[in-house]
Amino acid sequence: MKVIIAEKPSVAQQIAAVIGASVRRDGYIEGNGYAVTWAFGHLVGPAMPEAYGIEGFRRENLPILPETFILEPRKVKSGKEYKPDPGTVKQLGILHKLFDKAERIVVATDAGREGELIFRFIYQYLGCHTPFDRLWISSLTDKAIRDGLQNIRPGSDYDNLYRSARARSEADWIVGINASQALAIAAGRGVWSLGRVQTPTLALVCQRYLENTSFTPQTYLRLKLHTAKDATAFAALSTERYYTKEEAGGILKTVMETGCVRVTKAESRQIKEQPPLLYDLTALQKDANTRYGFSAEWTLDTVQALYEAKLITYPRTGSRYIPQDVFDELPALLASLREHPAFGTHAAALAGAQLCRRAVDNEKVTDHHAMLITGHTPGKLTPEQEKVYDMIAGRMVEAFSAPCVKDITAVRLECAGIPFEVHGTVVESAGWRKVWCEKEELHEDEAAALPPLAYEDTLPVRGCDLVEKQTRPRPLHTESSLLAAMEAAGKELEDEAEREAMKDSGLGTPATRAAVLETLFSREYIRRDKRALVPTEKGLAVYGIVKNMPIADAALTGGWELALSKIASGDMDAFTFRKGIEVYASQIANELLKVRIETAGEHTGAKCPRCGGQVVFFQKVAKCRNAECRLTVFRTVAQKELTDVQLAELLTKGRTGTIKGFAKSDGGTFEAALTLDGEFRPTFVFENRKPGKTTGRKTRK
C-alpha cells in the first residue's frame, strides 16, 4: 500500500478522486492500493522553552539556544494553559499507523518551503523511516495530478528545501523567543512580542508614520501660462517655484506684458511600453489592495480557494515568469477566455497572433511559475472571488498582448526669461492597455495632446495664472505599499527589474507576508485607518525601543532571507546560518536587556515646539529631553486623557483635530480641538468661538 499525505482534507479528496480511492475511513480515504490522508496545516512545531525546563522570563536564562529542537503537537489554549489539540493528536495517531503500514509515502503537501516543512516535521516527530517520494504540481486539475503522479521525484531531491524551511523555523523561534523575553524583562511589565520579520516590518510602518505626521508642508506657487498654435490651446507650467505671492505676482505681470512666448526645445519620440509581467502572490496582493481595498490575508485565502477549485495554478508563487513548456499551452488557455464578458474580445484577438514573450524565462522560474488560469470554467463565485479571478485572467491576457505605443513630446518655452515646460502624450496603439481600458492620469505638467511645435516658434500669451501648491509628505503606508517595501527590504524601488532582483532578499516570502501583517494587527501594533496603516501607541512604544537595533533593520533581515534561499539552492550550509542567527539573537537580547526600565514604555518622535528638541512621552506627561528647555505638557486635559497620537499632533502640528469627552464643571462633556498658547499650554479651540485656556486638571480616579 502507498500512503499519500496532502496538506488539508479538501486536497486529499481531489487526489483520491483522481486515483480511484473512494472508501472513506476515519482520517483517510482508501482504495486502489492507496490510502490518501491529510494534515491540517502545521500539526507539529518547535516546542516552547518550558519543554527545555525553562520556566518564566528570567534574565539569567537568556539567550535560549537549544542544541536540538524538540518537536511537539500543535497546542490550543485551555483556560490559562496551552494543551495539545485533541484533533491534532488524533490525526497524528492515524498518520503513525498509516506510515508504519506503507511501502512508500507520497508527499503531496503544498509544493513549497512550508509545505515541505509540514510533512518533514510530522515524519521526524513520528520517528518514521518509511521511504517517501515527492508529488510536485502547480495546479490541482485532474490532468496535473495524473501527470504529477507519473513523474514523482525522490524525497531526497528536496532535502535542501527542507533544510531551508527548518532553518527559517528555528531562526524565527530563536529570535522571537529571545527578543520578546528580553524586552519583557527590561520593561518589567506586560507581554511583548518581537520577531525576525515582524519587527522590521513594524519599523517600516512607524518610520513612515512619524515622517508623515512630523512633516511641515510648505506652500509654493507656479505660473501656468496659456497659449495656442493652429487653434490647439495648451498650458505650460513654470519650472521654477516661488514662495511669496509678491515675487510670483511680479513675474506674472512681466509675462503678461511681454505678450509672447518662444519655444526653446521641442523633442518627440516614440516609446513602447511593454506589457506587465504575470502575477506572483505579492504583486497580486498589492494590486488587489490598491484596486479593491482587499487585505493581503483575504487575497491569499481567496486565491487558495480558487486553486483548490482548480481554477488557477499554485498561488503562493514568488515568480512572475513561466517556462517554455507552459508558454506552449497559452493559446489553449487564452481560447478558454473567448466567452469572458470583459476579456473575451481581447483573448480572441490573440488567436494566431505573435504573443509577447516578456514573461517567458526558464531561468527565472524556481519552485513554481507565475499564476495562470487553468482553463476550467468557473462555477458560482462570490463577487469578490470573481474580481480576483478576473485580475489573474486579465493579467494573463495583458502579459501576452502587444506593447502600448506612445508618442511623447517634451517642450520647453521661455517668456521674459522665465522657463516653462509641458509634456504631451498621444497613444498610437493601446496594445495591452486595452484589456482593462484604464486611463492613465496626466501629471500637472502634461497635456493629452500638443500641436506640432518647432524650435524658435513664437506663440501668443493668452493668459497666465498663479497655481498654489503645497509640498506633501510621503503618504502613510497601505498594505500595497508595505508589501512592496517588504519585498524590497525597505528600499524605494520603482524599477520592475530592480524589484525582481531584490526578491530573494526581502522581508519574508510571498507565502508569509500576509501572516506577518496579521500578526502585527493581532498584537495591536498597527491598525487600519481606511486603507492606511497606522501604528498604535503600543506599536510606537515598541518601535521607540528597538528602532536603532539590528532587529529593526529591514536590510539586515532581508539578508537572512537571501541566506535561506541559498540554503534551498545548496549554496549555503544550514549550520553556518544557524550559528549566525544565534550570534544575532544573543546581540539583540543583550541590547534589549540594557534598555532602561523607565523608558520601556516611552514613545518618541515628536519635536519640541519651543526648542526643536526631542519630546519623550510618559504615562502622565510629555517632556522635552533638552535639559535647558524641559517643556512639559500634561496628558490629562479637563479629565480627558490624550492619546500619544493626539499629543504628537499637538506638539508637531500645533493643533489637534476635534476631540470628544472633555469634562464640564456641571458634569457634562464637550468637544473641542486643542492648540498651544504663547506659553505652550494646551488651549481649547471651539468653532466660531474664541480660544479659552484649559485647567489641565487630572482625571478623577
Regions found by a protein language model. Name each.
Residues 1, 110-111, 188-193, 268-277, ...:
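Conserved short loop/turn motifs at secondary-structure junctions
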Residues 1-169, 173-175, 473:
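Intrinsically disordered, low-complexity regulatory segments
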Residues 2, 81, 88, 125, ...:
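Basic, low-complexity terminal or inter-domain segments flanking catalytic cores
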Residues 9-16, 33-36, 40, 59-62, ...:
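Amphipathic alpha-helical transducer elements in NTP-driven molecular machines
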Residues 17-23, 47-48, 54-55, 154, ...:
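Accessory interaction regions appended to the cores of large information-processing enzymes
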Residues 87, 100, 142-225, 268-269:
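C-terminal or mid-to-C-terminal helical accessory/interaction module adjacent to the motor/catalytic core
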Residues 243-279, 285:
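Metal- or metallocofactor-binding catalytic centers and their adjacent structured scaffolds
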